[in-house]
């Protein structure tokens, strides 16, 4: 599986070619996503949740558990500033965009799905799509897209802040700075006044 991170649309800025067992593949893909996506402050009701990691868990486990391993098509996870796109070869059970309300889950690799459920990398069949919808709406305010065909495609829309890097052009320049002595003096003055 290839993981690609883009800042410049003309070339990828980071790449991880993952050729290992399913468990290690899962870990590397999650880490790649965490490296390129910010953990935004997201509330589910009154509880702060890590929507980024929950989305990654669902799309990575779905890709690994439902991929057609007899195909030579390389699975991909591409992260750019607008979306995450995951593609994998597929034994199609239908064609076109999947509708959450009409979706009927179909196990493509039941043995892999069962192992993933047993070790906690996936939940019951079909819950991944519901969870991805829920956490994508919390993370980006939009709906994900699932397209079934010979290539299964998952598209997770992103807010600009989800991929912004700290530093560089985002840091103001020429900001007046105080020496530590000046800062200490200012703090003491404020304490005396307070």
Q: Model-derived features: where do they sit?
A:
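C-terminal regulatory or interaction extensions
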Residues: 1-194
